[in-house]
């Protein structure tokens, strides 16, 4: 079998397995189930994957490649990182990632329940460092346009990034409408305001 044919077979097997995993869980899915759904015999599947877990890991790796491509694409296009308009663009980029790959997040929750997050923990380990590396000098430069508070900029942008993820995950994966009680545009604007300006007005400025 050529490499192209082998890759095509693996994609077909993984696609079939994914549909079953997200409905029945990992341990609730048998190789026989995957064989029936994919149209390949069990023996044929074992030619490509030594175990069922290898199929599961293959799915995760394929999603992670797409995730990294999307994340790097919008990170490269961010200008002044903490500008409110740029943060709004970031929010909608996160929306695109979450809504275009809902099964990735379902696999993550399966992993938490059935594997104690064995296959996903690395994805978020030292995540702020990964974001910092992707943004490079722009991250530090973006703190120089005003009186920066002293918060680690990598920590700040990563916190904002993850807040957007949580917001849209509630909508797509948990089917929660308007989790903050506002339309998306207003909710995003409020999150950005809270993250960049804080909760309190500077009364010292009002008295002068």
Language-model features: locations:
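Amphipathic alpha-helical packing segments from all-alpha helical-bundle domains
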Residues: 68, 72, 96-100, 118-144, ...
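Amphipathic alpha-helical segments used for helix-helix packing
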Residues: 99-119, 169-174
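N-terminal intrinsically disordered/low-complexity leader segments
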Residues: 1-8, 75, 203-208
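Helix-turn-helix
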Residues: 12, 16, 20-54, 58-62
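Hydrophobic/aromatic-rich alpha-helical bundle segments in the mid-to-C-terminal region
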Residues: 105, 140-192, 202-208
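Amphipathic, non-transmembrane alpha-helical scaffold segments
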Residues: 14, 60, 64, 109, ...
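Hydrophobic alpha-helical connector segments
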Residues: 72-103, 153-160, 204-205
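Amphipathic alpha-helical linker/stalk segments
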Residues: 59-90, 135, 140-143
């Amino acid at each position: 079998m050529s490499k192209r044919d082998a890759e095509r077979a693996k994609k077909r097997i993984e696609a079939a397995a994914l549909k079953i995993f997200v409905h029945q869980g990992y341990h609730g899915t048998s190789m026989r189930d995957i064989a029936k759904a994919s149209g390949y015999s069990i023996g044929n599947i074992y030619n490509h994957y030594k175990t069922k877990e290898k199929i599961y890991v293959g799915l995760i790796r394929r999603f992670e490649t797409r995730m990294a491509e999307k994340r790097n694409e919008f990170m490269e296009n961010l200008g002044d990182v903490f500008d409110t308009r740029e943060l709004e663009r970031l929010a909608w980029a996160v929306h695109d990632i979450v809504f275009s790959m809902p099964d990735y997040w379902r696999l993550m929750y399966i992993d938490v329940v059935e594997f104690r997050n064995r296959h996903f923990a690395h994805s978020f380990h030292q995540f702020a460092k990964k974001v910092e590396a992707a943004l490079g000098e722009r991250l530090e430069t973006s703190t120089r346009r005003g009186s920066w508070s002293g918060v680690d900029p990598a920590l700040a942008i990563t916190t904002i990034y993850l807040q957007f993820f949580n917001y849209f995950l509630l909508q797509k994966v948990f089917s929660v409408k308007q989790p903050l009680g506002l339309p998306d545009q207003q909710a995003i604007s409020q999150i950005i305001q809270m993250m960049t300006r804080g909760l309190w007005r500077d009364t010292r400025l009002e008295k002068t």
